[in-house]
Regions:
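A short, glycine/Asx- and small/polar-enriched loop/turn
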Residues: 32-35, 81-84
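Short glycine-rich or small-residue beta-strand-to-loop segments that form or flank ligand, phosphate
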Residues: 36-42
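Active-site phosphate-binding and catalytic loops of NTP-dependent enzymes
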Residues: 61-69
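Long, contiguous binding/interaction regions
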Residues: 1-29, 43-50, 57, 70-71, ...
């Protein structure tokens, strides 16, 4: 699956379950293992699990490989490995403590968050 399509699929899956503070980092210059790291915050263990399930389910439906899902038992930090894209779903305290944004560095990739606006309905002519 194309990287841009997989990245969009992940963002949409995270937004469907109300993931917060989504950041995407280009890691092609830092690692040969994956091209993107996506960080997202969740407000509870239940939400971290729901976000991970949403990402894994939508990836499978689209034909992408889900290589691994780790951390669901504890639920404070869940990692979903999709090969080219690695998703870290974290509660805010864990995210602040580990500061992965500093590790993956620099500026996040600019992506449009949220669904595109629906076209305005036109009144029917009768």
């Amino acid at each position: 699956m194309q990287l841009a399509r997989l990245q969009r699929l992940v963002i949409d899956a995270l937004e469907d379950v109300k993931g917060q503070d989504i950041k995407v980092y280009n890691t092609t210059h830092l690692s040969e293992l994956f091209d993107r790291v996506i960080l997202v915050s969740a407000t509870s263990n239940r939400q971290t699990r729901a976000l991970a399930s949403s990402v894994a389910e939508k990836a499978k439906q689209a034909g992408a490989d889900v290589l691994s899902v780790e951390g669901q038992d504890a639920g404070e930090w869940v990692l979903v490995d999709l090969g080219d894209v690695v998703v870290h779903i974290m509660q805010p305290a864990i995210r602040a403590y580990y500061a992965l944004e500093e590790i993956w560095g620099g500026k996040p990739v600019r992506v449009r968050l949220g669904a595109p606006p629906a076209p305005a309905a036109r009144p029917s002519r009768q």
